[in-house]
Amino acid sequence: LYLVQTAEKGLAWMRLTAGGKPGHGSFVHDDNAVTRLCEAVARLGSTRLPTVLTPPMRQFLDAVSDAYGIEIDPDEPEEALARLGSISRMIGAALRNTANPTMLDAGYKANVIPGTASATVDGRFLYGQQEEFERQLAGLIGEGIQREWLVHDQAVETTFDGPLVDQMVAALKSEDDGARPVPFTMSGGTDAKSFERLGMRCFGFSPLRLPPDLDFASLFHGIDERVPVESLQFGIRVLDRFLRNA
């Protein structure tokens, strides 16, 4: 299976700020901004939001079921995805809205209780899920926490069809007879958000034939982020043919 991005999640990066009464760290203190913020952050980080099966991911799961003979329960798709190995972490993020705390900031000295504390959260919502995601956030963050959008941009989605898709299929099969391109939703973000506003349909086509034992998803923004040379060479050949014929 070769993944082709036909959708990507929306961006909702936010700063959460809690206020409290500043004071001396040695005193009894029941109005602590750090504590209030951490409670909200812990709720966000420990809550797995409900599964939402969008059209691209339904097509992806159908392809996985057919290719690997795996029976997939639409209500519990992650149980089947776990059998796919490391890629399940990336694909699993495309089955629900997510909100991951990434940064914390509070105080300036060990013995001073700060008046404010803030956290940065990387939020991502599925296509058609923006309002529901904001409702979910409000319930988890709770009262007494201010939310400020740092980056907020739309989710996008298109269908897996048309002349470009036909050329992707042909280019892949020229290098791999058994290639089967399948659509999926990208949990990250690309320029598709901007191009979509211009009326352009966008596909993410980065053909790589990866070694089966490579935990490729773990390399994204990780230590020694890289692509195997053989995989890159394969992709160059496929993209060259695609661009010449598209």
Please name every model-derived segment.
Residues 2-234, 240, 244:
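Metal-dependent amide/peptide-bond hydrolase catalytic core
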